[in-house]
Regions:
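N-terminal subdomain of nucleotide-sugar transferases
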Residues: 1-81, 207, 216, 273, ...
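Membrane-proximal helix-turn-helix segments that form the acceptor-binding/catalytic region
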Residues: 36, 118, 126, 132-137, ...
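Donor nucleotide-sugar binding/catalytic pocket of nucleotide-sugar-dependent glycosyltransferases
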Residues: 52, 73, 171, 181, ...
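A conserved catalytic-core segment of Leloir-type glycosyltransferases
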Residues: 53-126
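Conserved donor-binding/catalytic core segment of Leloir-type glycosyltransferases
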Residues: 243-261, 267
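Nucleotide-sugar-dependent
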Residues: 261-264, 316-318, 322-323, 330-349, ...
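Nucleotide-activated donor-binding/catalytic signature segment of Leloir-type glycosyltransferases, i.e.
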Residues: 283, 288-290, 295-321, 378
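A charged, aromatic-enriched C-terminal amphipathic alpha-helix characteristic of glycosyltransferases
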Residues: 383-393, 400-434
Length: 441
């Protein structure tokens, strides 16, 4: 083996089954984290076979992984989401007005709860069985040694659980981008059942990975080996725009959860600065790209004309990145409670990769992890929704700098060192280090 083909790990054959309902180039935010793991496993010397969902063309963009995939099979989807997509779904997600209908909201509630999410949730029962039997065949034919799955949806973890029961030699790594809703909201009637289910499910996992300490604290109730991977920043220098945008642009990319996220505190502060003559209203431009354009419009249209609101449901990845790189400020809207902490969106790391200023608005209590991560990148920019004075002062500074063609210092080099691809690769080596024997195959 020559130097070009040498990898981080030893040279023993390591064959990974990458079981992921979402997989690039599907245009959802989770694809970014999935892509990072895929690249990390390649760097650690794995041969990878992929089982994933077969999505409509409008959900897929350009290929974003230019690395070798040994085998890939896209499973037809027949779940509740697929059923609705033929009638009322917009870009594979329900409009917010439909979600407020009693019947639909009740159905969605069951769809997200254990055990119903395994039957009618994303993926569904047909996806589950096709993936399981395809995986059984691949494990035997391709001598699979490792499994990787990522929640959500939970169905991938359950398939891995079944495979681990069938083939005990497999080394299973389970990733949680978020907690299952039944664990996240203890007031649900099936909370005890969900805890029992998750505890027995994760007994079969050899390693568990999650995005933050907050979620790790919850998962420690179900597993002893919790590892944290928040995200990574490429060490490659980004090409920053040489021309400052003619507008003071606020850019938001991603989904919106209207019961938890709230843009109105920012809008109120900006309107106050306009009223005081500090900001010229005509300088403002709002850009949005994501699955919930209607809610974003609801926040803005009472206060700003249509020509100052540029909203797209879907954009190709290069165009979305161009918006982020041209923005005066990239927005992160998150939330935090005494029960639910550690909500880290992958969009934060996507923003940090651009070298442009980031504003994090938290609805609720202080989110220390998010604030700490941002502190490696810029001196200010994290605010709770109630911190009107601090937010007002920061926006004033940002606007004056933009008006004077001055850039705001963002230390992309420092954040790239702190959350490097090497750190990611080392974590993957750690959680996958056990090389199983080839028994019972």
């Amino acid at each position: 083996m020559n130097k070009k083909t040498q990898t981080i790990s030893n040279y023993k054959a390591k064959n990974l089954l990458f079981l992921s309902y979402y997989f690039p180039p599907v245009q959802v935010s989770s694809s970014i984290r999935i892509k990072h793991f895929f690249e990390g496993f390649i760097a650690n010397g794995f041969t990878i076979s992929v089982l994933t969902g077969k999505f409509p063309k409008k959900m897929t963009g350009e290929q974003t992984i230019n690395l070798p995939i040994s085998n890939i099979y896209r499973i037809p989807l027949f779940g509740l989401r697929r059923l609705f997509s033929n009638f009322i779904l917009t870009h594979y997600t329900l409009p917010l007005l439909w979600k407020k209908k009693v019947f639909i909201s009740s159905l969605l509630s069951f769809r997200n709860r254990i055990p119903f999410n395994l039957i009618i949730g994303d993926g569904g029962l047909i996806y589950l069985w096709i993936a399981y039997f395809k995986a059984v065949k691949w494990i035997k034919n391709y001598k699979i040694t490792h499994l990787f799955t990522s929640h959500s949806p939970l169905v991938d973890h359950f398939i891995a659980f079944l495979l681990k029961c069938t083939f005990p030699h497999l080394h299973w790594m389970a990733d949680f981008r978020d907690l299952p809703v039944d664990i996240k909201y203890p007031h649900y009637m099936n909370y005890s059942l969900s805890k029992y289910f998750l505890k027995h499910l994760l007994k079969k996992a050899d390693a568990v990975i999650t995005v933050s300490k907050g979620i790790a604290n919850e998962l420690e109730k179900f597993h002893t080996k919790i590892n944290i991977y928040s995200g990574s920043i490429s060490s490659e220098e980004v090409q920053r725009p040489t021309i400052i945008s003619p507008y003071f642009t606020f850019n938001y990319t991603g989904s919106i959860y209207p019961d938890y996220q709230d843009l109105s505190p920012l809008v109120k502060v900006i309107l106050s600065l306009i009223e005081e003559g500090i900001i010229n209203k005509k300088d403002i431009l709002w850009t949005y790209c994501g699955l919930h354009p209607f809610k974003y419009e609801q926040w803005l249209t009472p206060h700003f004309p249509n020509e100052q609101i540029d909203i797209k449901a879907f954009l190709p990845l290069p165009e979305a990145r161009e918006r982020q790189q041209m923005a005066a400020i990239n927005l992160v809207l998150t939330w935090s409670t005494s029960i639910q902490k550690g909500i880290l969106t992958t969009k934060l790391f996507e923003y940090l990769d651009t070298g442009r200023p980031v504003l994090v608005l938290t609805n609720g209590v202080l989110e220390t992890e998010m604030k700490r991560i941002l502190s490696f990148y810029q001196t200010e920019g994290y605010f709770q929704n109630s911190e009107n004075k601090g937010l007002k002062n920061w926006l004033t500074t940002m606007y004056i700098r933009w008006k004077n063609n001055q850039t705001y210092h963002c230390d992309r080099k420092k954040i790239a060192q702190k959350f490097s691809e090497d750190e990611r690769n080392a974590l993957i080596k750690k959680v996958s280090d056990k090389t199983p024997t080839r028994k019972n195959t």
